[in-house]
Amino acid sequence: MENRERAGAGAVGSAGSLGLRVEQAVFSSASLLFMSVGVEFFSYTAFCFLVTIMGLVIPWSCTLAMIDVYSILVGCPLRVPGVMVIVVIGDWVLAILSLAAASSSAAVIDLLLQFHGSHCSPRFCGRYQLSAMMAFLSWFLTAASSLFNLWFIASR
């Protein structure tokens, strides 16, 4: 048990992976909700990009969380090399896109705040800042998941 868990800590089909996936979905949903509350986000391409990417991360994370739950309940982790490579590539792509979306949104928010609120009311700018922060947290978890799965593939 200890050897199996150590080799698969954070890899698809483990409790660590389930925790990462649930947290990814929660932070991505929070980012999406904070951004979508303000109707004005359509005016900025970076904000639309963030909404689009968070909208992709949520179903990806939820689907892999369901696979993790199934693997934990059945007791047979899904460790097929081809599937693991697809998960790693998907995580890498979403991690890169999440970082790009969070960074560009944070830059636009910083620019809007430098104009002393003339282009963004403090209420909306605060929500946009929270959205970018949640997107960064989602990116961190997606990158960590990708690295755990890559480590598992390399250790085989």
UniProtKB/Swiss-Prot annotation:
Residues 1-24, 68-81, 154-156 are cytoplasmic. Belongs to the Casparian strip membrane proteins (CASP) family. This is CASP-like protein 5C1. It is found in: Cell membrane. One of its GO terms (cellular component) is plasma membrane. InterPro entries: CASP_dom, CASPL-5. Homodimer and heterodimers. The keyword Transmembrane helix applies. It is a multi-pass membrane protein. Residues 46, 103-132 are extracellular. It holds the Pfam family CASP_dom. Keywords: Cell membrane, Membrane, Transmembrane, Transmembrane helix. The chain crosses the membrane at residues 25-45, 47-67, 82-102, 133-153.
